[in-house]
Amino acid sequence: MREETREQPAPLRSGLTTGSCATATSLAAARLLLTGVSTDAVSITLPKGKVVQMRLEFCRREDERAEAGTLKDAGDDPDVTHGALLYSQVRLQDEPGIRFVAGVGVGTVTRPGLVLAVGEPAINPVPRRMISEHLQQLADDCAYRGGFEVTVNVKGGEQLALKTMNPRLGILGGLSILGTSGIVRPFSCAAYIASIHQGIDVAHTNGYTHIAACTGNASEDTMRRVYGLPEIALIEMGDFVGAVLKHLRKVPVPRLSLCGGFGKISKLAAGHMDLHSRHSSIDLPQLAGWAADIGADADLQAAIMAANTSQQALALAHAAGIALGDAVCAHALAFARSVVPAQVQVEVFAIDRQGGIVGKAGMQ
């Protein structure tokens, strides 16, 4: 009998960005206007030269305009837009060039600080360039000297946008059309990190001198309670504290509060920039060592090293009168200060699962 072998996991499947979808649907609609040809698929060239073919759900003409739609395929990435219908409507115009319009489910920029001006549709620079290049090539091929009005839509985009950072960034009414490579890399986290940078940029540009970077909802609630900070000054960093600290080298906001659960703050204290369990773990011997530095005896150190969780280690220290939470925050503060510019004042809060503050260090 043949010995069974464990099945190898299939490689994660990449997808295509909303920018690629907008390019493909704009090209198909414009081609229908200029040539009368309607197809069920269209090929586009991505920024790095790769050619991809995208299936269309429809491509049709309605009076003075044409429209084409495709279903967003994010591959194996847990993208909020996966499966959404993205469609573009194109009209011809006398003036050369491209005029972009935010259609149904696509947001509009309402705050300064982003790469797009206030009032512009939230179609980012690379997707704009992709659309422009493809439509210009089509115009050249057809000897067309006019321009195009391109309206990009996402069915249900206004509701989907509530699951993103757009409302906090001041992008209202729907989603952003994104992408720099045209390809969605599964679990690359690039879009999340970009939203962190955008959040800092928007807060800074709008005159906020104090921001709070938080790992989740409980830490955000704590910062609201302590400082009364508005949404625009709250940066949802998740596990990506490094994205915050490094970006402050470019945009040195004067005051930074870091707030997260005790376990995650202990990882920051140990010098980790990514606090996710895939990339960093809680070092119980290190916690025991820090406890020893502030008076923990050998028995307490052994108990901390044998603890099941960081919260249990914290509880053991608290019961013995050892301020482990403050000590961990002090080490996290020292590491954060080593990354950000000297002019940025930093403080660190550690909280429990109920949002209670269990440690603090820094800025008074």
Swiss-Prot record:
Chain ranges passing through the membrane: none
Protein's UniProt keywords contain Cell division: no
Keyword Methyltransferase on entry: yes
Catalytically driven reaction(s): Co-precorrin-5B + S-adenosyl-L-methionine = Co-precorrin-6A + S-adenosyl-L-homocysteine
Pathway the protein takes part in: Cofactor biosynthesis; adenosylcobalamin biosynthesis; cob(II)yrinate a,c-diamide from sirohydrochlorin (anaerobic route): step 6/10
Alphabetical GO biological process terms: anaerobic cobalamin biosynthetic process; methylation
Leader sequence residues: none
Molecular-function annotations in GO: cobalt-precorrin-5B C1-methyltransferase activity
E.C. designation(s): 2.1.1.195
Keywords: Cobalamin biosynthesis, Methyltransferase, S-adenosyl-L-methionine, Transferase
Family from the record: Belongs to the CbiD family.
Protein name: Cobalt-precorrin-5B C(1)-methyltransferase
Gene: cbiD
